[in-house]
Amino acid sequence: MFSLDSFRKDRAQHRQRQCKLPPPRLPPMCVNPAPGGTISRASRDLLKEFPQPKNLLNSVIGRALGISHAKDKLVYVHTNGPKKKKVTLHIKWPKSVEVEGYGSKKIDAERQAAAAACQLFKGWGLLGPRNELFDAAKYRVLADRFGSPADSWWRPEPTMPPTSWRQLNPESIRPGGPGGLSRSLGREEEEDEEEELEEGTIDVTDFLSMTQQDSHTPLRDSRGSSFEMTDDDSAIRALTQFPLPKNLLAKVIQIATSSSTAKNLMQFHTVGTKTKLSTLTLLWPCPMTFVAKGRRKAEAENKAAALACKKLKSLGLVDRNNEPLTHAMYNLASLRELGETQRRPCTIQVPEPILRKIETFLNHYPVESSWIAPELRLQSDDILPLGKDSGPLSDPITGKPYVPLLEAEEVRLSQSLLELWRRRGPVWQEAPQLPVDPHRDTILNAIEQHPVVVISGDTGCGKTTRIPQLLLERYVTEGRGARCNVIITQPRRISAVSVAQRVSHELGPSLRRNVGFQVRLESKPPARGGALLFCTVGILLRKLQSNPSLEGVSHVIVDEVHERDVNTDFLLILLKGLQRLNPALRLVLMSATGDNERFSRYFGGCPVIKVPGFMYPVKEHYLEDILAKLGKHQYLHRHRHHESEDECALDLDLVTDLVLHIDARGEPGGILCFLPGWQEIKGVQQRLQEALGMHESKYLILPVHSNIPMMDQKAIFQQPPVGVRKIVLATNIAETSTTINDIVHVVDSGLHKEERYDLKTKVSCLETVWVSRANVIQRRGRAGRCQSGFAYHLFPRSRLEKMVPFQVPEILRTPLENLVLQAKIHMPEKTAVEFLSKAVDSPNIKAVDEAVILLQEIGVLDQREYLTTLGQRLAHISTEPRLAKAIVLAAIFRCLHPLLVVVSCLTRDPFSSSLQNRAEVDKVKALLSHDSGSDHLAFVRAVAGWEEVLRWQDRSSRENYLEENLLYAPSLRFIHGLIKQFSENIYEAFLVGKPSDCTLASAQCNEYSEEEELVKGVLMAGLYPNLIQVRQGKVTRQGKFKPNSVTYRTKSGNILLHKSTINREATRLRSRWLTYFMAVKSNGSVFVRDSSQVHPLAVLLLTDGDVHIRDDGRRATISLSDSDLLRLEGDSRTVRLLKELRRALGRMVERSLRSELAALPPSVQEEHGQLLALLAELLRGPCGSFDVRKTADD
């Protein structure tokens, strides 16, 4: 006989057997909401400590229990309030406990609850001091303390139901037709965006491939049925199996139907007095009735519900652990239907008149059936020599053709230099004595006697400005000044220019013409003979292309070698090999801090000369001192709490408050503030301008960043007017080689941007990370160069000890494609691995191999690692290889100018974007893009508008245009300079007749510059394989099926579109295919920030590689052989003609690369013109079934 008491006893025993936990449940822990529904400070602090709490909880339980997901052990129950949402998180391991969270959105409330749970886990010892995970063995030991051995949870994953549930879900899925796409832009997407970023998603086709289903297994007895219980033994057994049946039923129905309640689909009707008879009507998955009796109403209902649970399990709708399946598994039929739609090839519809034109062209200009696109390797007998490599040597100092000086001319020039030197006496006396001066003879003798010398000089010793002058002085005073031609490299443009100007001033008017500089977009070379040329490392690398042995150069000084940027490490490889070609050349490596013995060993044990520096006293303040000074005592506890963590978040308000405090109470003098990047610079600048208000005229706020042209950065060296305080906001660009004389205060955020490359995802990540101790020393030194100063470090003293001594060399943490290409230009006979193994720190062989493979994929290298004809052209263009390829193809496809603008804007963003105005910038970009679906064409229109207003010569019009379109004038000037430089590069690569043709609308190279689809297609051809296919439907990691959402698929896997690209919020996509330049990794997700919709026929016709065709004589499919991202279908004639058109375009590219483009025979030019006109018309036509609309959820 069944009784409620025996039922409760059995249920308690069952739970103890399952969990070994006492029956009483702990009271829920609540994350209290602040008044008004906002998140309280305590809640924010929890989320700062646990920024990704749901991931962390899943990881702990997953590792402890050996399962791939923890959905069964973490159950989120949602409650909608009037102003906010409440979530109760039920935790089933290691003990049963509940926590609550609140938020304006569902995901916010879930994260609050999860963060509170993380705090519990940490208190229980399940997380380390830095919230790190333990290994599985340790979790087993910890679990025993709770009476919950992990072994009892070590169960295999539940088997997926062996059937399709088409009839179980009444909701129908409406895909957008063949090739079509639907997407919800409604509330669900907005609320779940953060969930997507935190937990990841899987597209429908991937999910289906992961589920090993037997689709032929029939549904077991899914017809409606009624169970009249004459004895309740079956019900008692069912209740033992399902101790909480009503909860389980509700959860199953809610998950399967995506509803917040199960009341409408699960209804009880109970009658009787002494014996209660309960009838449960279940309307899901089909109408079913279950009847049970009991002494009380609750008992009868529980029995009926248990019978229902038993039935659902027999249908495969409950897993082997008596838990609900995922939402996706309940909707497997819809998933399969949608998956079939996604896999179906898209139909090609080419108008008949265009097909006839293609046939006519191919009949007139047939492509030989045996013709196969070659690898385009450079051959001496079938290609015009390209570039200056095959011509006369270039003078590294002046850039003119190199001709050695005749002996008589050398004597005359040396005598002239000696006379000029003697006349400059008073100017030299005015120069201040520097710590390096007493070591003059030691340094000069070492340089004279040894081919390589390392000079280690502390900050302020004068090595950068004085050693080049000392070399020139010795040569001139010994009567051999004409033989002294020194190239001094600097890591940054601003330091090359400023140091050259400083040295020129110190040498005086008579020798000023002997000092010059050369940086990207700006050059002022010195006169030859007795010359000092300051340049960036990249400039010297290009000079080595045209003069591999540096004939005519007496010394190369590599300054700031300790920074270990990738170009400097590459230069050292070349200079080491250069010693055999030019033994007279003297190499000087100068370093402020660093492992100088390492450089000495690299160059065979060369001497290291240490020069002490001079620094005025600098008083240092650390975070705890700064917070006390600012009266921010409430921050002290928080910062102490996070002291042991590696969090690199910068509080811009704190930076602003500190600068204002220094201004109000500190000593007079300039303030130099080191910030990680451009966004932080703009953020602090805007905050300062808002705080200063009407008094802004008393301050000179100057940003310093590589995005800003040189002419706009020179103001930092100028003395401000009396009563005006200079505030310089800079990245680490101002750390070395640049001295701003009036700086008294340095604010050091302790952070900088560092590029890191993920070999697995092949994605770069620009991360904000802690600087090294060497960086801290350099930054502090900027305050004590010319007077006593103060350094304010926005990190605690304890953080300084945890910082690494030196930065990781850039060559070990960045993509290597450009470096491998440079290696092939300088030493083509060596393999990439062989060449880069000679670096001071050689990169990972796998990283080098990946770079080689990518260059082979884009057609720059052949299988033997030789430059192809395309690679030979790319060698002249100073930008990333894929962007350079796009430029080369644009010259061939006669749409050059817009591609030059796009590449320049991808190098320097023209928009004045900041953390505060990102949404406004995105709106402007969308307007500029019109209906092109392209961030890149938005760049083109922005620059075109700027060029137009410049012609008006009306200042107010220019300012209005900049303000309305949120454009940044210095960046636009830089972009203009880049376009000019690229034009010169293209001319050097024999792709145009003269540089001015590149920007001339009437030139042949711009004949199709107005054809937007062609421009986007050519950009895609250069960036390929950077191609995205938009797919409908996704499944979250938690198993929720979202049919009206989209995923973005690349060759490497799924990515996300960043909010900054216009295609993220587009209400209509004309094409399912997007191209992009760069993907970046942030918080574990891979994002694309710039994208363009591309015509599917452009993808088919313009990409490299082979295509695969299946033809039954009537219909045919064509796809890319190296990717599953494009499958097209059409009638056999259309597919055949498109394949031949593709081959004709490949032949055109090959011909154009094998000779000077402007010198092609007129007949070939005519053929190419007809072909391009045909291509433009084809891409101008309608997309047909490629048209894609994003629709809102019903």
Swiss-Prot record:
The keyword Ion transport appears for this protein: no
Location of this chain's protein in the cell: Cytoplasm; Mitochondrion; Mitochondrion matrix, Mitochondrion nucleoid
Residue numbers binding ATP: G457, D458, T459, G460, C461, G462, K463, T464
Domain DRBM intervals: 53-121
Region Disordered, annotated ranges: 1-27, 150-199
Residue positions of motif DEAH box: 559-562
The protein's Enzyme Commission number: 3.6.4.13
Keywords: ATP-binding, Cytoplasm, Helicase, Hydrolase, Mitochondrion, Mitochondrion nucleoid, Nucleotide-binding, Phosphoprotein, Ribosome biogenesis, RNA-binding
InterPro entries: DEAD-box_helicase_OB_fold, DEAD/DEAH_box_helicase_dom, DNA/RNA_helicase_DEAH_CS, DSRM_2, Helicase-assoc_dom, Helicase_ATP-bd, Helicase_C-like, P-loop_NTPase
Biased composition (Acidic residues): 188-199
GO terms of biological process kind: central nervous system development; mitochondrial large ribosomal subunit assembly
Keyword Lipid metabolism found: no
Domain of life: Eukaryota
Official protein name in the record: ATP-dependent RNA helicase DHX30
Record-listed Phosphoserine modification sites: S6, S226, S380
Catalytic activity annotation: ATP + H2O = ADP + phosphate + H(+)
Record-linked SMART domains: DEXDc (SM00487), HA2 (SM00847), HELICc (SM00490)
Entry similarity comment: Belongs to the DEAD box helicase family. DEAH subfamily.
Domain (Helicase ATP-binding): residue spans on this chain: 444-612
